[in-house]
């Protein structure tokens, strides 16, 4: 899944968090996203 750069790091529909420095696909805390860098928070926040 690809993060939306407008989300600003909040949880989006697929439970993915966007890395602020790379908003177009570096996500964490969800099995459905590729995590190259980890960011704070949980998929339920």
From Swiss-Prot:
The keyword Secreted applies. It is found in: Secreted. Disulfide bonds join 3-16, 11-28, 18-33, 27-39. It comes from the Eukaryota. Keywords: Bromination, Disulfide bond, Hydroxylation, Ion channel impairing toxin, Neurotoxin, Secreted, Toxin. One of its GO terms (cellular component) is extracellular region. The modification 6'-bromotryptophan is found at residues 37-38, 44. Expressed by the venom duct. GO terms for molecular function: ion channel regulator activity; toxin activity. The modification 4-hydroxyproline is found at residues 23, 40. The keyword Disulfide bond applies. The cysteine framework is XII (C-C-C-C-CC-C-C). Mu-conotoxins block voltage-gated sodium channels. This toxin reversibly blocks voltage-gated sodium channel in cephalopods, with no alteration in the voltage dependence of sodium conductance or on the kinetics of inactivation. This is Mu-conotoxin-like Cal 12.1.2c. It comes from Californiconus californicus (California cone). The lineage of its organism: Eukaryota, Metazoa, Spiralia, Lophotrochozoa, Mollusca.
């Amino acid at each position: 899944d690809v993060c939306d750069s407008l989300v600003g790091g909040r949880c989006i529909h697929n439970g993915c968090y966007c890395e602020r420095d790379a908003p177009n696909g570096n996500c964490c805390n969800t099995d459905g996203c590729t995590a190259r860098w980890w960011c704070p928070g949980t998929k339920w926040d």
